[in-house]
């Protein structure tokens, strides 16, 4: 990379020190998710969303089972196991347009959870807590200040090889950026109904836990910086071209 790149722009703050160590010209201009969420916040109305989907009578729990077929097959049934146990909440599944209603219905036909397509930000903006499959969604959830539990279950061999090849303490972006176990990660064998229910109770009923997690989400925002990643990149490029 060093041989073919004049400058590298990264979207996660912990990436810069890594490339700095290899004497690469690298800049962290900010994370584009901050731009997306800032734009969303300026244009959306929470009350309209709740009214449109007949929500708001109960606290909402966001279920984000992922976007890939295999992860949804693994994660959605587990996440839906909470629905019957906690009737005091409205559970909302964040659906993605790459999967049909029929695909989701095979897991949801006996569930009182609601499926809403292509509205993840509106769901998070209205939620009391969230159960999230590991990925970018873990960071998005934190940026909406929603307490969360992260779930992930990979192929056992792939997981073992991954741990051997990549020496990292965490898999969620929230914990990686903060370098601290702020959100619970239920991985592999720990990704089961009993452990999920235990951690779910903490993020919904334990106010001290919720306050502490949100405090750390504030620190996360400070580390990420302000919105404007694309504008910052353009600024860097123009400055370099003028040299």
Feature roles, as predicted:
Residues 1-243:
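Nucleotide-activated sugar donor-binding and catalytic core shared by glycosyltransferases
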